[in-house]
Amino acid sequence: MKHYNDLFKIIHREGYIFIASFALVSFLLASFNTKLGCIGFIATAWCIYFFRNPDRYVPINDDLVISPADGVIQEIKEALPPPELGLGDVAMIRVSIFLNIFNVHVNRIPANGKILALHYNPGKFFNASLDKASIYNERQSVLMETDQGQKIIFVQIAGLIARRIICDLEEGNEVKTGERYGIIRFGSRVDVYLPLKTALLVSKGQTTIGGETIIADFGRKKTAQFKFKRK
């Protein structure tokens, strides 16, 4: 039974209905036409691949902010936080991570701390790689306070293909770095907002691994010492 449980753990639950549907259609197609059946099974395999949910080795240190998503850093710029969070016109550093359809789409908590506020904002579905996606696209914004007292924001943004954002967090949740908290289906973007004086450890064009890549270090003046924990 443990092996079956392990199998389901490596696939995000949001994928179960898609995988089952693709598999059923594939069997039906195969009963009529072998080639169509093969195409269906290839699509099913891709669906399993898309919803994969691998463990990661998360760096454990209260000063660190880790990437909430797999992808490529599309942009790093000074920007105002999402207006729906009510933080006013205090500029922050925005690190934008673009996910293509081949990336792992499970999202992870970027730091230890407490969830202060969440806000879902319905919107449009522009290409997530465009700068205006941060403003106009459907998004789920999360404000948290880290254990070090720093306020940071992470935002799930739907893209041209992505049409569903899943966020399992609630206001008041105590969270740990690297914990899974949601998923965006089929191509998307995740923005991370940090205080202006934060020491960044990434650059534009860099590939990130959700739960592993260190984006920033609030204790950069100290000697960085941390361990890793599998999650």
Curated annotation (Swiss-Prot):
Catalytic activity reported: a 1,2-diacyl-sn-glycero-3-phospho-L-serine + H(+) = a 1,2-diacyl-sn-glycero-3-phosphoethanolamine + CO2
The protein's required cofactors: pyruvate
Origin species: Rickettsia canadensis (strain McKiel)
Any one of the GO BP annotations: phosphatidylethanolamine biosynthetic process
Single GO MF descriptor: phosphatidylserine decarboxylase activity
UniProt similarity note: Belongs to the phosphatidylserine decarboxylase family. PSD-A subfamily.
Subunit text: Heterodimer of a large membrane-associated beta subunit and a small pyruvoyl-containing alpha subunit.
EC number(s) per entry: 4.1.1.65
Annotated disulfide bonds: none
Entry note: cofactor: Binds 1 pyruvoyl group covalently per subunit.
Subcellular compartments: Cell membrane
Post-translational modification as stated in the protein's UniProt record: Is synthesized initially as an inactive proenzyme. Formation of the active enzyme involves a self-maturation process in which the active site pyruvoyl group is generated from an internal serine residue via an autocatalytic post-translational modification. Two non-identical subunits are generated from the proenzyme in this reaction, and the pyruvate is formed at the N-terminus of the alpha chain, which is derived from the carboxyl end of the proenzyme.
Membrane topology: Peripheral membrane protein
Record pathway: Phospholipid metabolism; phosphatidylethanolamine biosynthesis; phosphatidylethanolamine from CDP-diacylglycerol: step 2/2
Enzyme class: lyase
Pfam families: PS_Dcarbxylase (PF02666)
Protein name: Phosphatidylserine decarboxylase proenzyme
Residues annotated as the enzyme's active site: S188
Keyword set, alphabetical order: Cell membrane, Decarboxylase, Lipid biosynthesis, Lipid metabolism, Lyase, Membrane, Phospholipid biosynthesis, Phospholipid metabolism, Pyruvate, Zymogen
Domain of life of the organism encoding this protein: Bacteria
Site (Cleavage (non-hydrolytic)): G187, S188
Gene (name only): psd
Function: Catalyzes the formation of phosphatidylethanolamine (PtdEtn) from phosphatidylserine (PtdSer).
Record-listed Pyruvic acid (Ser) modification sites: S188
Gene Ontology cellular-component annotations: plasma membrane
